Amino acid sequence: MAGAASPCANGCGPSAPSDAEVVHLCRSLEVGTVMTLFYSKKSQRPERKTFQVKLETRQITWSRGADKIEGAIDIREIKEIRPGKTSRDFDRYQEDPAFRPDQSHCFVILYGMEFRLKTLSLQATSEDEVNMWIRGLTWLMEDTLQAATPLQIERWLRKQFYSVDRNREDRISAKDLKNMLSQVNYRVPNMRFLRERLTDLEQRTSDITYGQFAQLYRSLMYSAQKTMDLPFLEASALRAGERPELCRVSLPEFQQFLLEYQGELWAVDRLQVQEFMLSFLRDPLREIEEPYFFLDEFVTFLFSKENSIWNSQLDEVCPDTMNNPLSHYWISSSHNTYLTGDQFSSESSLEAYARCLRMGCRCIELDCWDGPDGMPVIYHGHTLTTKIKFSDVLHTIKEHAFVASEYPVILSIEDHCSIAQQRNMAQYFKKVLGDTLLTKPVDIAADGLPSPNQLKRKILIKHKKLAEGSAYEEVPTSVMYSENDISNSIKNGILYLEDPVNHEWYPHYFVLTSSKIYYSEETSSDQGNEDEEEPKEASGSTELHSNEKWFHGKLGAGRDGRHIAERLLTEYCIETGAPDGSFLVRESETFVGDYTLSFWRNGKVQHCRIHSRQDAGTPKFFLTDNLVFDSLYDLITHYQQVPLRCNEFEMRLSEPVPQTNAHESKEWYHASLTRAQAEHMLMRVPRDGAFLVRKRNEPNSYAISFRAEGKIKHCRVQQEGQTVMLGNSEFDSLVDLISYYEKHPLYRKMKLRYPINEEALEKIGTAEPDYGALYEGRNPGFYVEANPMPTFKCAVKALFDYKAQREDELTFTKSAIIQNVEKQEGGWWRGDYGGKKQLWFPSNYVEEMVSPAALEPEREHLDENSPLGDLLRGVLDVPACQIAVRPEGKNNRLFVFSISMASVAHWSLDVAADSQEELQDWVKKIREVAQTADARLTEGKMMERRKKIALELSELVVYCRPVPFDEEKIGTERACYRDMSSFPETKAEKYVNKAKGKKFLQYNRLQLSRIYPKGQRLDSSNYDPLPMWICGSQLVALNFQTPDKPMQMNQALFLAGGHCGYVLQPSVMRDEAFDPFDKSSLRGLEPCAICIEVLGARHLPKNGRGIVCPFVEIEVAGAEYDSIKQKTEFVVDNGLNPVWPAKPFHFQISNPEFAFLRFVVYEEDMFSDQNFLAQATFPVKGLKTGYRAVPLKNNYSEGLELASLLVKIDVFPAKQENGDLSPFGGASLRERSCDASGPLFHGRAREGSFEARYQQPFEDFRISQEHLADHFDGRDRRTPRRTRVNGDNRL
């Protein structure tokens, strides 16, 4: 995600060491030193550990002793090394005299593959030791990233092997190998498959050495991918069945490949080709005049970064392109730069500023509020986000501003401070930033903004500016007051709502405005604490064993238990190839209170008694009298690390044998329940997360039936020998599977929460089943389609008595309140009354009223009407609310108050706080708002109009002077290049469209504009930046901490120039005739056509526990008329080396200067949902052609280790010699693509919401699903569904 910034904090770094010093440094780091580790967890005190560098794997490891590694980080993940105590890990111990290390003895390693980096905070024994580590690691970081791909593969292989071979015995078992391959996304169908491959490698023993493992890897990769459509190999007659190491690609053949297939002009020089091959291979035995590739090495080259699709020459900044005015550039810009997560409870962090600046961001935001001691603080105002000091932020900016780029940085000041604190801000700007702060114009006589070259290493202030001659005065603000901005809220924070099913209290985010209370869906109560989750202390240490997979309880009476144990161990070890030492523990059949250890050795099962005794009232456990343990768990853990010793053998306990039938005693398991019965049970629990597991009729088969998104769904679970399979995820047992999905989502965001059986139904079940939940229920093929139409739920009050005429109608009296009403066409509605659920009643017998159900409004209105945006669950009108404190509390919560509404009888919302003080503050403020709601709203609107500015701060504003946007000034003499305007995305959408896009582009040619996410994006999600970019907006500010598609597009835009943060807009955008939404206005720009074939992939990341089933989506994103998507088929169960059949995908691009080629790898899960795996996005103008590797990145745009696609790509002019469009252009292209590749999405639906893309194809697909679902529903449902139209019954 970050650009190529220097690893040292100040950007300079130590001078490069000599070759001799490198050897000395590497040897010293490999030996290691003892240093003190300062933890990020408050519960852990600093500890002394041995730190070493493992050169074979390029990792830093630490341990207490010599034989057990406690932790490791990959050097390739290190982003920065800072000298001194420059992390919060040191701050936690400032008051502890035992841990006050000398500043010069400390350093911090920042590493990770996400926006928020992790820290390794260390205290060495001397300053020389610190320098040794910093110099050595700085060299290793660069050397590791620049290493040739074969060397990177070698290091990766050793890392995988050593992760299993922890004792460094240079051998692992076949079972370990099978598990390892599963971890790297390769399915081994059975042990026989491995034994056959190992036989090919002349493997004769039960263990595998590293050399054999490496050879197996080469064999697996080549054998799977030699079938790819590579004409060069076919032409070279290298496709025969010989082993790849016996086939060679000579230097002349490789040179021919580079020239003819890759179009590499430099390859005409034979010496350059020779040098390239030698640097790639790094093999002393092939440092000869004519080096060569073995065939599998050549295929590895095709997938390598050395064969990238991106033209790396564009990574360099071209100074000649940096002489235009700032308004001609796209400038990398951050919104809410200080945040590390969401906008209501995450942490404000100095590290976020450092991270953004080192990623090349050139416009950052400072949200300033009055703080203590006369100095402002920075945070997201009136929220739970933490606060940081303004002065600390300035020091961080100074330190990191020009590490990644020397081009100017713009500080966008969101100022909420008093005049006094504004003056202090101005003073600190000058004091801290010094000469880098721009305080006067570059050229007074200029008629436009200065260029990036003119502003090198300068920091500009964006802030409102006073009129000439004012000491301070009020100026108009361009930001309208809005109740929906969380910064304008009266109070907000975490409160708790009771779950009506399990009566647990769950956190929700509440916002009190001048007229309403908004509350979110269930959220996390963690308020952005940087600390890692503290480990939970186990209660009852003597019972720790009960949840371990090796504990089987009582297996049988008498000798039955012994026989059952022997059978379990024998079946498990023979089937899985488990090693000696595999074991289980069971209750003793003959000695009450004792246990029996049964284990596998030399093909037989042996048994050992575990004795127990009481010692001072507490139990003790032992095998021999001289070594006693406090718990059975401690005893087993000990012998997993220390060998069992007796006269005949010495052996560690190795692999626990899982329980096979433990699920039968669980409350969620049903041995004899049909699908229909399961559905009927779940229909009575209208809560997502309700679930049960049932045995299916097919052998070794189960089903999880659950509720999600209001619907009942099912998924199959298959028992395959000793393994339980859910989709392609493997578990040791059904209990392990359920336990895993109680902690992780099973379907979208749904976790298994409420186990359902008859006892649970009696407590929480409704009287009437929810038949609506059976939409999709009868068709196992449709698991994921949501409700076909959103329904508006309300409450109604009866105007007359009504007596039901049929069984599916309600009976009610005048003034009855009918809840949860769904309005239907034809004069008949459905609702809940008198214990009856969703029965029919005539709509002309009732009048609508406010109801609790109506508090959850339709999604279309959420973004516009709520400060919580998509997180909104409910809203209450404060003047209509009545507040009552519950002194007695409720259900284990002491601090509870109730909110009721006079218009809704017998309804209240119980809300819990964490403390009495918090409860009283909420109650007080809600009551105050209820009395003064109208006055508060009027006051807020009055305050919006004027803002006081200190002269000292105003004088620091030179070029970026925010003013209200005035469309009438565009193109006139009144337009001033020093003025700029800011727009929330919703306002910007009014200008970046076909009607006004050309006019807005005219504005941006002279002046700057900044666009930022709307305030309702509390989850810090981002908007689509493409329409803003093509209309010339320079400062399109995004949440850098959010790993979504807009940020990935942003990273792609600034690829050119090596993430320097400035990209010159195409010259066509400075053509006054150019219209961003009209391709006929493209003058002097040649359209192009692209043809792509996806051939294969390597080292795709895993998503969860299963082996992925990947497919690739290829997208051209850019101008509205160019946008189009296509996708491959999916490959079953292979993420290590999948291959796709040759199929060309064609794209025609009218505006290649503003077009991106985007690859996204998804996996298709068991619900036919697509889950993100990896992506790569490039500007089209920087693509190379031929057989090219596409290096893949994660969602944070960080490079994934060795992950890549192999594609064949051709780019050619879209116009033929006679001037006509090529056969791959225009409508014919789209038609051909539809015929060739199945699902195709094209043309952005930019009318209305900018995020409502490609909706028509999805809508068509949804309708076809509904039709098919209705077919199954009508075929399988016993009772026909009836609707009413105009009073008539319809079947």
Curated annotation (Swiss-Prot):
Question: What are its E.C. numbers?
Answer: 3.1.4.11
Phosphoserine occurs at 1222, 1228, 1249, 1264
Which reaction is this enzyme known to catalyze? a 1,2-diacyl-sn-glycero-3-phospho-(1D-myo-inositol-4,5-bisphosphate) + H2O = 1D-myo-inositol 1,4,5-trisphosphate + a 1,2-diacyl-sn-glycerol + H(+); a 1,2-diacyl-sn-glycero-3-phospho-(1D-myo-inositol) + H2O = 1D-myo-inositol 1-phosphate + a 1,2-diacyl-sn-glycerol + H(+)
**Listed InterPro entries:** C2_dom (IPR000008), C2_domain_sf (IPR035892), EF-hand-dom_pair (IPR011992), EF_Hand_1_Ca_BS (IPR018247), EF_hand_dom (IPR002048), PH-like_dom_sf (IPR011993), PH_domain (IPR001849), PI-PLC_fam (IPR001192)
**How is the activity of this protein regulated?**
Activated by phosphorylation on tyrosine residues.
List of catalytic residues: 335, 380
MF terms in GO: calcium ion binding; calcium-dependent phospholipase C activity; guanyl-nucleotide exchange factor activity; phosphatidylinositol-4,5-bisphosphate phospholipase C activity
**GO BP term, example:** cellular response to vascular endothelial growth factor stimulus
Positions in coiled-coil regions: none
Residue ranges occupied by any SH3 domain in the UniProt entry: 791-851
Q: Name one GO cellular component term.
A: ruffle
- According to the entry, every stretch annotated as the SH2 domain falls at 550-657, 668-756
Q: Where is it predominantly found?
A: other
Instruction: Give the protein's recorded name.
Output: 1-phosphatidylinositol 4,5-bisphosphate phosphodiesterase gamma-1
Source organism per UniProt: Bos taurus
Q: Please name the gene that encodes this protein.
A: PLCG1
